[in-house]
């Protein structure tokens, strides 16, 4: 995953992370396209014993992923994603489960023909500063490899 990364330097910041008080916005490029322009995907994810992969399981932890389609291309879509829960590989595993693995995500069945890594980017992170109580938003532009995919023909061309 490329983009913004947040580290906790103290217990208060760590509590914000674990309590899901930090809002992350992701950009992903998925295989195919959703029928609806936006939606909420819910499932239960469980880690494999070595935590290399997550999979949907009835005894997994609840997982909520919201998406909004930004652009549709021939064979894939650019989507905006936010997560209400923070599970290991949540976006990757959820998109694959719903039939739309990330481009470049070999672990979850995505094609590596157009990009060699999972096409997932943390576009922004928003949180309340622990001392000033002001909302801080940090953002990061899409990396070159994902920008190149945006230059391919759109589905309506």
Question: Locations of the language-model features?
Answer:
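RNA pseudouridine synthases
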Residues: 1-157
